[in-house]
């Protein structure tokens, strides 16, 4: 059974490809959460006794820090977990910015609605990830810092979003997740540990089978098959009809995880791109970068 996921709110193999998450993180890097008024409003809400019997799957959402003011109005009846995006790591495992995570009422609020809360930790880029993953002390520094953030906030777990992992760090990534899992399970009762993983493993950097066994779930980023800089317009998450599409990705994960279906989380997008194009034909050539629309 493939878990479904609600995502916040080719093609891929190109020199100017950038992660959608990285683009948003850079776009909003100067954004400051003004939580006081939002949290005070949320405290006036009465907790809802959610009935999870109607949910046939685990349903996970992401709350980006730049959309923090939306959290009191989310429909928590449709969620079982929510990840706060994000705590940004340095190459050496320090926390660059956690966006006031430990002081956010959102954590207590979501938990009062019966929803588990995880912190999403991010680091993007081959050089940065090589520096972090190849060094024991950097790995331990990151793990200790993330564990402190989760414990001090009373959250339920961690979600690791490392993107553009180089092939040279395949084994070190598994080692990092083993070390992280050990530390979290040693400190917390039944922590939830998940990872964001790519739609296509272009460089053979991901040991899906080992990572699925270590974690509670691999969140398959099933989007950005066509991206902002694509030479042709197309769907960001085509179900089928292309060589690389959702069907290909799911089958690839099933094959490489030895059918660990209880560990696969399919991430689906709530966005698309609006490109300037040559004509109105399907998959027309683009004449510039696309703008994300939700």
Q: Model features per residue range: what roles?
A:
Residues 15-148:
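Glycan-recognition patch characteristic of GH18 chitinases/ENGases
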Residues 129-133, 151, 171-172, 205-207:
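Short secondary-structure transition/capping segments
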Residues 52-55, 73-78, 110-113, 151-153, ...:
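Extracellular/periplasmic catalytic domains that process cell-envelope and extracellular macromolecules
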Residues 4-14:
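Hydrophobic h-region of N-terminal signal peptides that target proteins for export
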Residues 75-85, 135-163, 207-225:
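Structural recognition of alpha->loop->beta junctions
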Residues 59-61, 80-84, 117-121, 158-160, ...:
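Hydrophobic faces of well-ordered beta-strands that scaffold small-molecule active sites
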Residues 91-101, 144, 165-294:
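Substrate-binding surface in catalytic domains of secreted glycosidases
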């Amino acid at each position: 059974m493939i878990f479904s996921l609600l995502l916040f709110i080719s093609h891929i193999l190109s020199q100017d490809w950038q992660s959608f998450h990285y683009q948003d993180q850079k776009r909003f890097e100067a954004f400051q959460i003004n939580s006081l008024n939002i949290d005070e409003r949320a405290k006036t809400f009465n907790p809802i006794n959610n009935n999870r019997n109607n949910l046939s799957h685990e349903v996970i959402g992401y709350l980006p820090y730049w959309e923090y003011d939306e959290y009191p109005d989310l429909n928590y009846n449709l969620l079982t977990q929510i990840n706060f995006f994000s705590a940004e790591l340095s190459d050496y495992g320090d926390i660059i910015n956690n966006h006031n995570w430990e002081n956010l009422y959102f954590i207590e609020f979501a938990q009062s609605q019966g929803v588990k809360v995880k912190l999403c930790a991010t680091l993007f880029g081959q050089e940065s990830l090589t520096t972090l993953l190849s060094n024991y002390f950097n790995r331990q520094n990151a793990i200790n810092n993330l564990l402190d953030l989760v414990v001090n906030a009373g959250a339920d777990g961690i979600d690791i979003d490392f993107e553009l992992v180089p092939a040279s760090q395949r084994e070190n990534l598994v080692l990092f997740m083993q070390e992280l899992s050990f530390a979290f399970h040693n400190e917390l009762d039944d922590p939830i540990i998940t990872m964001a993983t790519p739609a296509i493993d272009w460089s053979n950097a991901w040991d899906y089978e080992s990572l699925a066994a270590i974690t509670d779930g691999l969140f398959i980023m099933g989007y950005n098959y066509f991206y902002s800089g694509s030479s042709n317009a197309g769907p960001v998450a085509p179900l089928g009809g292309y060589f690389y599409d959702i069907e290909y990705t799911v089958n690839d994960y099933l094959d490489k995880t030895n059918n660990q279906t209880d560990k696969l989380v399919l991430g689906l997008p709530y966005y698309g791109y609006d490109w300037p194009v040559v004509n109105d034909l399907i998959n027309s050539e683009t004449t510039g970068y696309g703008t994300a629309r939700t």
